[in-house]
Amino acid sequence: MMNMQNMMKQAQKLQKQMEKKQSELASMTFVGKSAQDLVVATFTGNKKLVSIDFKEAVVDPDDRETLQDMTVQAINDALGQIEDATQKTMGAFAGKLPF
């Protein structure tokens, strides 16, 4: 019975630590960039788009495809950074589970 109580205490402590790390991650800013930094997308750690900036050189009404491609590139770059940070932050807890 004592073991079960200890496991529950450990699980609660771990849950609080995880919540703290998730909160820290959510408050972080991630900046994704396209080739030559022509498009820059900024996200929070919980994957909310904060801003997107287009350099004048990429804004060409006759070439929308390049702008679209670079926008996707910048967004995917930022989301990849968030995923990496999430894995590093939250993956550390996987081996600490008391069961």
From Swiss-Prot:
Binds to DNA and alters its conformation. May be involved in regulation of gene expression, nucleoid organization and DNA protection. It comes from the Bacteria. NCBIfam families: DNA_YbaB_EbfC. Pfam families: YbaB_DNA_bd. Signal peptide: none annotated. The lineage of its organism: Bacteria, Bacillati, Bacillota, Bacilli, Lactobacillales. One of its GO terms (molecular function) is DNA binding. HAMAP family: DNA_YbaB_EbfC. It comes from Streptococcus mutans serotype c (strain ATCC 700610 / UA159). This is Nucleoid-associated protein SMU_394c. The keyword ATP-binding does not apply. Keywords: Cytoplasm, DNA-binding.
